[in-house]
Amino acid sequence: MAQRFQLNSQTLPTADPLKRVSLIPRSAEQRLADNAGERRPLAPRSHEDNPFGGHTDDHHVAAPADHNKVMDHNSENLGSIVPKTAHYPHPSEEILDANIRHSMVPKSLGPNSLGGRFGPGKKQAFHRNGRPMFSLSDDRVMADRVLKTHSPDMIFFDVTSLLSVVNDIFKSHVPSIDSSAPKPSLVFKDYADHTSFETFADLIDQISCEIDCKCLHGGESHGMMTSGLHLDSRNTTTFSVLSLVSKYRWDAKLVLVLSALAVKYGVFLLLAETHATNQLTKSLALIKQLPSIFSRQNALHQRLDKTRILMQDMVDLTTTIIDIYQLPPNHITAAFTDHIPTAVYWIVRCVLICVSHISGASGFKQDQIMSFMEVSEIHENSERLRKINAYLLEQFKKSKMTIEEGIIEEEYQELIQTFTTIIHVDVVPPLLRLLRPIDFLYHGAGVSKRRVGINVLTQKHVLLLISDLENIEKELYILESLYTEAWQQSFEILWVPVQDFWTEADDAKFEALHMNMRWYVLGEPRKLRRAAIRFVREWWGFKNRPILVALDPKGQVMSTNAFPMVWIWQPFAHPFTTARERDLWSEQEWNLEFLIDGTDPHSLNQLVDGKYICLYGGEDMQWIKNFTSLWRNVAKAANIQLEMVYVGKRNPKNGIQPIINTIREENLSHTLPDLFQIWFFWTRVESMWESKQRMLKAHGIKGREGFKEEEKDLVLQEVVAMLGYGGEGDGWGLVSKASDMMVRAKGNLFSRGLAEFNEWEVNIPTKGFLTALNDHLLMRLPPHHCTRFMLPETAGIIPNEVECTECRRTMEKYYLYQCCLE
């Protein structure tokens, strides 16, 4: 019959909170303290009723739990043991059948707790397998006690290297006695650089002796005792070990204690590996009672495999703590320091558990596998360590992110200073700051490509071609055609690929792209710093479209995107300054020669010969056939020499390739050579619009003033009209001769005007062909029209108002998001 223990807290000496381990729930202990009455333990009737009757130390000990009985948590007689049929579960526990309490699955930890399977608000200890679990308040008290053992005196050593050696030992396995089993490949590491570990050999031996002497004498060798004495002994040993390493930093403490465990585990494995072939180790194994153990491979492997799980969790948590102490001191906050003592305590305690299992290997019976209690003990502690590690890792990642963001911000501000306020005498220093840690470039095409230093750009004008790897083919194609010897004498081009993330596929694409480039290419662009990427995105406006940043020989930024000037005027735009851009526009007239410059050499030659040139576009093949037929008839009737050129539309896709093929096959007219040239034609028109807007912005003209300024700018009006034509799929046409006026109209209107040639041909002798045609088209303008104008993607230059090219009224503004896949 089970006896009821009555407790008198006044007669017992005060015990340390961690030393005072009870099977009584903490909530019940609180009620006991508040009870005015007094309880005294009843004398046991016999030794069988109370096997600990003779024990009189100062520990608060409850009777060992009978597996057929469960704790009565609601009973007024606290601490009593009652039959399982009278079990009343505590509200915080799940209601489980008493017969399966020993197979209870571990509960998950709460989000704010680190000490065990208890979350916020769970004040009582859980009891599993007769083994009490500390509550959260216990952990706080325990952490305070751990802190009292901590008095570091700035002793530092290479904890990472020593932990690496320890981890190598932990990963070793007991060799199989089966000769047919495959042997693991041997990889020998060089530990020649680890001579500094000799300093700690004596301390590691001392820790090992402390664990062996106290742990084993306390009955822990087999890891089978579950009484309060067993746990209290392990707790005492934990603090004894912590006292030995009191003068070391937290991470160093752990590595030294784990080293002691590694020595014990390693010696055990050496005996297991060589006892059958080496007389000395065979004798040692005999003294240690190991030969029979080594013959029971299944049980031995099961025991050590379970132990290695806990070892790995200890190494993982220790690695995290080492990483934490690599942070700058001001970033090791309370989020770490409040929990690291707890982590240290449990790792040292888990070392004792592992020692128990390793030392206890010689004590288990023939073919006996690990008991449920032993497996559960490892599982519980692994769960605890992983919980702590997950929390510390999360805090560590947050701290690393904060540090990295601070570094990026500092480097970003430094780059702003470099390219705005600092005066340089050469272009190389600012380039080195922007591109570091990359310090070399590629130069030359194909097999002649070689590595050179950045200093080859000394005292040169440099164009930084900044792009990603996905949207640069067209720019590269056109730049290659423009990169003549005259260009190379004026400035150098340096390609800087910019991507937030790099993959192996990106590396391969980069290699393929830069192999055929004749200009300079940044080496290893994947190493470009995040601050540099942020700078070119935010300060220089790089988004999706490539940009061309112009630097003078002293590193001063001439233009954050010289592409519009390059597309419009090519090398004549040098040195790409705002002043140069203004001068070029002041000298430029709107004519067909300017419109097609650099895009269609054939048409330029025809202009030189005095022929009329008609540019047209659209996607309606029937209209194209009718339009070209009308023009042939008019040209023949008017006795003029006419060349027609199909220029497609803006953002050409593969969908217009069949149209180009039909035009060529049926010999309807000329076309631009390929899709790249069509893209370049319309990109030049977009660049004209962007350049004009940039001029207005540079002069501080905006709002209504900008609108009025645009009204005066005939070139800008014509550019807007062209962009309106190119953005639609409908047909349109434009005709001119050399430097004469240009006549333009939408497709149906133009076709109607050509069909009515008989009505206006009489005016040709007096007005001229182009003026007569233009006047007739103006008379045929429909009273109602719908004109659309899609702005090109530019660096944030969006005018508030745009004038309609047909009626000169202000156009309504809409937002268009478009995705066209072909």
Curated annotation (Swiss-Prot):
Sample GO molecular function, one term: protein homodimerization activity
A GO biological process held by the record: phloem development
UniProt biased composition (Basic and acidic residues): 28-62
InterPro entries: SEO_C, SEO_N, SEOA
Region (Disordered): 25-62
Pfam family, one: SEO_N
Effect of gene knockout: No visible phenotype under normal growth conditions.
Tissue specificity as recorded in UniProt: Expressed in phloem sieve elements.
PANTHER family for this protein: PROTEIN SIEVE ELEMENT OCCLUSION A (PTHR33232:SF16), PROTEIN SIEVE ELEMENT OCCLUSION B-LIKE (PTHR33232)
Quaternary assembly: Can form homodimer.
Role summary: Scaffold protein required to form the phloem filament matrix in sieve elements.
Name under which the protein is recorded: Protein SIEVE ELEMENT OCCLUSION A
Name of the coding gene: SEOA
